[in-house]
Structures are given as structure tokens and as C-alpha cells.
Amino acid sequence: MFGGNSNWRGPVWFPLNYLMVTVLERYHRFYGDEFTIEYPTGSGQQLHLGEVAANLADRMISIFTSDQNGRRACFGGTELMQTDPAWHDNLIFSEYFHGDNGAAIGAFHQTGWTGVIADLIRRRHGDVESLGDVIRRISMAPEPTAPEPTAAGQAETVP
């Protein structure tokens, strides 16, 4: 734990942060607006869990968006990515991100789990169901009906 590879201490890992946002949203649905916590810690500001979840999601999304100077945190100090029009809008979904400045670090070929950012963007800015809600909804859908025999004895598909 103290030495060697420190990848599991400090960087921003999207799967864990995504799960945190999701569970905070779920707890907010249960506890409502009356249950608040101090956020950020030491600020004296009380927010309900939905507000905390939204803030965390926005911070994750901001890693990919351009700031007031047109720079993206995910590109860090790589000037080619920050300034070249051929590269600036080609986002990097790396394995994990620097905990202080949001720069993409880790393997660039392990992008699958960073793709959860698409769901957070959709939920924060698209006003649509989360993927979990969609899966729950379609999981509870009635089973398709079996074909009914026709007068000629052949099965006919019921829409």
C-alpha cells in the first residue's frame, strides 16, 4: 500500500465517482430535501444529497468541457491538444484523471468505464431517464405474447 504503484490512491476514477453520484441521487429520493450535509466539508454550507450529487456530476463533466480560456482539463499541459483545431475537440477518455487538475492519465486504450460520462451528461443536461431507470423499466415490461393460432392453423404474431 505504501510504495510501488499508487494508481489506486488519489486519481479520479470514473466508475467509483459515477457510483457515488448514483447512490447520492438514490438516497436523496428516499430522504428528500430535509436531509442535508455540509458540502464542501468545512464550508458551513448545507446541501441536500441531490445537490451534492449534481455538484459531483458537474465536476466530472467539467473535466471534458472548455473553460473560459478554451482549455480542457483532460488535456492537461499538452499544448497540441489544447490549441490545435485538429485535436482540441477530440476528447480523451482515459483510464483515470489527475485528482488536482483533471488531466487525463493512465491508459488511453481502457476507455470503456470513462464512457459513463455520457450517462451523466444525459442525466444532467438532457432531462431523460438514467440508464438504470431505463433498464429497470424494461425489465418490468410484460413478456411478449405468444403467437395465436389462426383459423387456418398457422400462428399469427400479436403486435
Task: Give residue ranges: language-model regions.
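Acidic, mature catalytic/reactive cores of soluble proteins
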Residues: 1-159
